[in-house]
Amino acid sequence: MRHGDISSSNDTVGVAVVNYKMPRLHDRAGVLENARKIADMMIGMKTGLPGMDLVVFPEYSTQGIMYNEEEMYATAATIPGDETAIFSAACREADTWGIFSITGEQHEDHPNKPPYNTLILIDNKGEIVQRYRKILPWCPIEGWYPGDTTYVTEGPKGLKISLIICDDGNYPEIWRDCAMKGAELIVRCQGYMYPAKDQQVMMSKAMAWANNCYVAVANAAGFDGVYSYFGHSAIIGFDGRTLGETGEEEYGIQYAQLSVSAIRDARENDQSQNHIFKLLHRGYSGVHAAGDGDKGVADCPFEFYKLWVTDAQKAQERVEAITRDTVGVADCRVGNLPVEKTVEA
């Protein structure tokens, strides 16, 4: 893991993250103009960072937040589509992989159902190699239709990459899911605003440490007329230490080199802090001393997760018993979310 240079090597993946200024757009023409601006920025960055293998732009950086519902549906894109064609051309010209936001991506039943909040990973040949749909939209504000799975893709120089989006990152489960599928770099694209800056910076660092993985965060900056976005895009080592972090500046960039061999060596040879290994080999020292085998205990000890998998409805009811049983809150209503209990069919 190295920071401070503009290079990369056969063993290091040069990763850049961008504090892209949150755009305020209203129509397809504006979206496509902004997509071309992102493409131009990427190509320019490659000149300044010749070692750059991967560049990451924030959530909402392409379309902005459409606060008008009609505009949200009217600007919802297809994948592939006009926006992705612009990004693919830039990836080819810059000979660089890119991660871009599509908010939203048309639902299969468009326009009868809300769009998805989607990230795409495009390789240096211009091919879309991963499409991730946000699993945990930022309720109650975000009205995106939720996705249902994470992915791992072999990226530049073989580094294994997963994508997550903004509020996804507040749930340890999604990080663990990516890591246990083999992700070595988890990319978190955000359109995160104040007041939750400190919590979000802390969460990404903690999850890098807990999952023995690299983390790259790209967050929006600026004010879009509604929210103020705190930036602080960052690249974090698999030991939880920050390699590089921007401030709040619009269009700020950070860059670091992530060693492929170093993370694989750590996962194979580290012991006391090898969290992903130890989780599935619980208490192996004591189990071995007892003569009960040399693998520790693999069984899941967490009753909640067992219940969630075997009876999701009962798990939901258990959560409601310690929180609330409606999605809306009577004392602070948001939209038309119900504040009286409803029964699902």
Curated annotation (Swiss-Prot):
The active site consists of: E59 (proton acceptor), K134 (proton donor), C166 (nucleophile)
Gene Ontology MF: a single term? amidase activity
Q: What class of enzyme is it?
A: hydrolase
Q: Does the keyword Hydrolase apply?
A: yes
Q: InterPro entries, per this entry?
A: Aliph_Amidase/BUP, Aliphatic_amidase, C-N_Hydrolase, C-N_Hydrolase_sf
Stored Pfam families = CN_hydrolase
| Range of residues in the leader sequence | none
Q: Which UniProt keywords apply?
A: Hydrolase
Q: Which CDD domains match?
A: aliphatic_amidase (cd07565)
Domain named CN hydrolase: which ranges? 13-260
Q: Name the EC number(s).
A: 3.5.1.4
Q: Does the keyword Cell division apply?
A: no
Catalysed reaction equations from the record? a monocarboxylic acid amide + H2O = a monocarboxylate + NH4(+)
Sequence similarity: Belongs to the carbon-nitrogen hydrolase superfamily. Aliphatic amidase family.
Describe its partners and assembly state. Homotetramer.
Task: Write out the function statement from the record.
Answer: Catalyzes the hydrolysis of short-chain aliphatic amides to their corresponding organic acids with release of ammonia. Hydrolyzes propionamide, acetamide and acrylamide. Enables the organism to use such amides as both carbon and nitrogen source.
Q: What is this protein called?
A: Aliphatic amidase
Organism, as annotated: Rhodococcus erythropolis (Arthrobacter picolinophilus)
The protein's gene is named amiE
